[in-house]
Design a protein with these regions (language model features):
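Thiamine diphosphate
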Residues: 2-102
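Short beta-alpha junctions and helix-cap segments that line functional grooves
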Residues: 104-108
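Hydrophobic or amphipathic alpha-helical targeting/insertion segments
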Residues: 109-114
Length: 114
């Protein structure tokens, strides 16, 4: 019997491409949702080009975030550490890449050692 005359009841389901109806999330949106899952409601930060999409996603997904604008990344990491110690909540500092990231090292090391 030729394959083109097979009854339709024996026909296989069309192959799935793995797509679903779920919306496709951007990396910044996934990051903000992860912050939510960790209970983060306050972010200390110094905006920059590399993290501007995260700031946009924070405003779009969770506009109730309390953002504390810091003037220097090192001060922001110390502020996040102090916030965590004083409240028992997650202390979060958001910095841009390059010098912004390296400026956080002292504060991160201090938090790690405590």
């Amino acid at each position: 019997m030729p394959t083109d005359t097979m009854p339709s009841s024996d026909a296989a389901a069309p192959p799935s491409n793995g797509a679903s109806d779920a919306p496709i999330l951007k990396g910044s949106e996934i990051f903000v949702r992860a912050l939510e899952e960790e209970g983060v409601d306050r972010v200390f930060g110094h905006p920059g080009g590399a993290v501007i999409k995260i700031y946009d996603a924070m405003e779009r997904i969770q506009p109730s975030y309390d953002h504390v604008l810091v003037r220097h990344e090192q001060g922001g990491t110390h502020a996040a550490e102090g916030y965590a110690k004083a409240t028992g909540r997650v202390g979060t500092m958001l910095a841009t890449s390059g010098p912004g990231a390296t400026n956080t090292v002292t504060g991160i090391a201090d938090a790690y050692l405590d």
